[in-house]
Every structure is written in structure tokens, then in C-alpha cells.
Regions:
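Sec-dependent bacterial lipoprotein signal peptides
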Residues: 1-9
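Surface-exposed short loop/turn segments
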Residues: 12, 74-125, 135-140
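A short amphipathic beta-strand at an alpha->beta junction
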Residues: 30, 69-71
Length: 164
């Protein structure tokens, strides 16, 4: 009876919205990927640092084979740079093992914020997308955990960079 009472309490949410479409990225030879949290209540949470490190690696690895940029997070020759900035505004960490083994005790995994493409010199935003990922409990132990949400944000970032 406890199992039935806990299941189906919250729904999974996976939403994104293009808030500023990208016109062209042809003028950028170099990219810098940065990930930040909005405020101490986000950045001091358990799992935040690990999440940003994994997300940074995945985004850089996803961008590199596209050939869009000569360098990513490296030295540049003075030509224009594009900052791929992720601002995390909502966050709650849930690990994969916790989701699998103790899903009925795990809270919803939450990862939300903004993906901004900025001209590094002027600070002008040349593309922007908002996103929110919440795990819910309808899929029980198969619900998303933070690692799956990182993969979704990586895919959204790549989509923003490559869709014109």
C-alpha cells in the first residue's frame, strides 16, 4: 500500500524555450564554455560542483567535433570569441545509484537555467535558450537523475549552436 501511495505524486518536466534565436556564428573562431550558478543557495548545494565539471566536459566534447570553432577554451589569436555560458537557476542533485536503489526516498532531480551565446568582447547575447528538467516520480526508479539531465542540457546547447 505504501508503494501505491508514493507512486504518481509528481510528473516529469522537460521543457525548453528558444528566447533569442541565433542568426549566425560564422564570425567566431574561438569558443569558451562557462557554467555558473545563480547565487549561493545553488552553488553550495551537494553535487553542484561535480555536476558543473561533468557538464563542462560533456559540452566541450560535444562541440569539438562540429568544427564550428578553431579552439575551445584554449589560446586564441585575437579574433572574436563566443562564450557558451550556462547559468543554472534551479538545481537539486540526485545520483544515478540513489535513483535506482532508493527511488522512493529520492527527491526530484532538478536542473534549470539559461544557455546563452555571448560575444566575449562586447558581452552582447547572440543566442539564448531557457531550460528546465525535473525528474518526477511517475517512472519510479527509471526517472531521470542529474546525469541524464546533464545529457539533455548538452544536447540543447549543441542544438542552439548548430540550428540557424
Amino acid at each position: 500500500a505504501l508503494f501505491v501511495g508514493l507512486a504518481g505524486c509528481t510528473e516529469q518536466v522537460s521543457q525548453f524555450q528558444l528566447t533569442r534565436p541565433v542568426s549566425s556564428l560564422n564570425s567566431y573562431q574561438h569558443a569558451i564554455v562557462s557554467i555558473h550558478g545563480e547565487g549561493l543557495d545553488i552553488t553550495t548545494q551537494y553535487g553542484f560542483r561535480e555536476t558543473t565539471e561533468v557538464m563542462h566536459k560533456k559540452i566541450v566534447s560535444a562541440i569539438r567535433p562540429t568544427g564550428l570553432f578553431n579552439t575551445i577554451n584554449g589560446d586564441h589569436d585575437g579574433s572574436s570569441q563566443l562564450e557558451v555560458a550556462i547559468l543554472i537557476t534551479e538545481f537539486r542533485y540526485v545520483s544515478g545509484p540513489k535513483r535506482s536503489l532508493a527511488w522512493f526516498f529520492a527527491n526530484d532531480a532538478i536542473l534549470g537555467g539559461l544557455i546563452q551565446l555571448k560575444d566575449k568582447d562586447s558581452g552582447k547575447i547572440v543566442g539564448e535558450m531557457s531550460f528546465i528538467e525535473k525528474s518526477g516520480d511517475q517512472k519510479a526508479m527509471l526517472s531521470d537523475y542529474t546525469g541524464k539531465q546533464i545529457n539533455k542540457v548538452t544536447n540543447l546547447t549543441l542544438a542552439l549552436l548548430t540550428t540557424i
